[in-house]
Amino acid sequence: MSALAARRATAAAASPKPEQPESSIEEVSVSGALTLPSPKRRKTRQTSPKPRSKARYSDDVPTSRQFFQATESLAEQRTGRFSPSAPDSDGGTSSSSVGDSDEDMAQEDEFEDRREVDGERDQRKVSVAANMSSSGPFKSLDLMPVDITSQFNPKDNVNFCRITEGQLASAEMNDGHPGPGVIVSLARNESLTIAGLFLLTPLQNTLSIYSTALSPSMSSFPVYAPTSHPLPVISPASTQAPGKESDKTLLLIRENRCGIDGLRNGAVPGFSNIWLEDNGPWGLRGVHPVVGSFPVPVYPYCTPPSWSHAISSLSSSDVNLQTPFVGLVKGPKRSGKSTFARALLNNLLRRFRKVAWLECDLGQGEFGSGAVVGLWILDKPALGPPFTHPLLPSRSHYLGTYTPLTCPDEYLVAIRHLIEHYKYELQYTSEYSALHTTVHDKISTHVPLVINTQGWMKGLGEELLNVIESMAQPTRVFSFESQSEEVYSGQGWTSTPPWQATQLPYDPAYPTTEPVETEVTQTYSLETAPVSALQARYTPADLRVLSAITYFHASLHPTQSVPVTWDISSPLVCTIPWEVELGIGKALEKVYLIGEGSEGVLEEDLPIALNGAIVALAEMLGSYEDEPTVYEQGRSPPPTDLVNILGLAVIRSLSSGNSVNPGLKLQLLTPLPPSYLSRARILIKSGALELPLPGMIDWRRGGINEEGMLGKGWEEIPFLDVGGLDVIGGERRRFRKNIMRKGM
């Protein structure tokens, strides 16, 4: 047996070994040699055969799409999925979640494997070549898209200069914004991306930001760039003439101490880190340039070519001054509809003194809170997400819901009244003289209108959109392309026919049918905005919570010349309220309840219905015959042409009066200025709109413990019920990964 074993060993040694395939993977090391541990094998069900993807680490240079997809997958791994509109949870346990979906658990398993492969190493400091046209996977999933969004290398006293607060004061930059600044010089092929809060002042040549061109002036524009939204890319405008004496674009960047960065304290869970740290690398508070490696996942604001073409059509040669501009923007959800409408508004402000904005989206208002349709008049561009520029409306109506599904008739009546108010009261104005028009070189004879519609494009939503379009009679329609869907066209199935508007023939016997001579409506087809997986971190419900909390922490002003400020140093439960009396002959006289179930509230239950509720403060524009009582069960609110909504308020508490002074005393939290609050006469309350949970708690460090908050036990805290209910299946679902038995 020993001889046979020896011969077998000799034959095995002499036989050629199979060659190992040469790996095409070139490992990229950040610090020293990088050794990749072999990932654990996991049994997964593959629904469709897919080619094996390339290795994680490759030496090829990515394309732009591959680069963003890779960065987005990293963002999902690092940020996780958190919803501020959902109950908070600690670590991996959750006592408030009823269950997680299979998709969520699969994503968690995938992220665990990635962390095991990465070994929790930081690989952000790997640079990428500027050539983004070649194909192939990227070098590391941990790369930030900084080399794409910023093409600027600051050098002191060359293209970058620091300015002290005293030097700004000597240059007559006394606009109420303290702090130092920096002057940046951008070449024609350079761009700069900044995260945070800052004031932007163009000094030389025209620059572009958020699809908006800003010309040199002494005016400063507040810019809000949280990491929860696309970051603005500042670059020289493409319309700049190449033969100018100086091809450098100079801009001044200063601190913007508006107070909204107080979200770092934790006022809205999930949004505490969107403003990054207080001190920036340039020595400016809250200003974080994206130059070099960046500590958090970000993605830039991109302007598709179709957007640029549509915006460029607003030139002086194309806009007919005899027919006021009325632009309607429509498209599905998540298409960039509101973003483009905001860019359209900003570019119109380059030629017009004022621009009107009609908000038809109940879910996500641009200049106000949700559940309101309104008309806003602006004279300055809005450079930031919707929650950063709340404004007082010119005329608005409160529907008390985030969708017109439950009140389509009231929705159309409110929008019809707003369109009529614009046409008869705001479209043509003689407020400004010819001298003002000449000095500012802007048109002030009429006010253009931008209509932002809802993203509901099917069924009833399509019918509502068609009615709005027929009422507004827009001169320009900007339509976003809908994603193609497979429609079954078999027997018995039909699709919705395309909308077509036809004018009735003119009949002298019926003068009302005379056609109105209007310019042919121009339609622009727009492509959807670039999609990033970072957008999936926050749902529309999360953004509504953020908008509501920041709205009640804001301080609004009657004029847009005074910027909005926020005070988020303390929660709403610790904010000093306004005390207003409710009763006949008092400051607030009547209460109206709207929405489903409102007719069932009895008069004696009115304090219970109002306590802790969000209400709309409205003024009466005319006389209205109504019952001389504070509240009448089932009473309908006054007509829309007699009511104007000033804003929203939270009734923090109320107390009953006495025999000498009957009525109720309300403690209101509202961002309205005193001049607007004194005009309010009635309250409108809907049961579909409630204050989000972050507005009811003390979110400060140490403000909440197991016993309660604010020195009170949980049983003494109003509006909150923290008692859990133990039910079967109420705990979080978990998958067991150690069951590997055959036949199961």
UniProtKB/Swiss-Prot annotation:
Phylogenetic classification of the source organism: Eukaryota, Fungi, Dikarya, Basidiomycota, Agaricomycotina
Binding-site residues for ATP, renumbered to this chain: 331-338
The gene coding this protein: GRC3
Segments of skewed composition (Acidic residues): 100-111
Localization per Swiss-Prot or TrEMBL: Nucleus, Nucleolus
Catalytic activity, EC: 2.7.1.-
Compositionally biased residues, Low complexity: 1-14, 83-99
Biased composition annotated in UniProt, kind: Basic and acidic residues: 112-125
Organism in which the protein naturally occurs: Cryptococcus neoformans var. neoformans serotype D (strain B-3501A)
Function description: Polynucleotide 5'-kinase involved in rRNA processing.
Keyword match Signal: no
Single GO MF annotation: ATP binding
Main location: nucleus
Keywords: ATP-binding, Kinase, Nucleotide-binding, Nucleus, rRNA processing, Transferase
Gene3D superfamilies per record: P-loop containing nucleotide triphosphate hydrolases (3.40.50.300)
Region (Disordered) location: 1-131
Protein name listed in UniProt: Polynucleotide 5'-hydroxyl-kinase GRC3
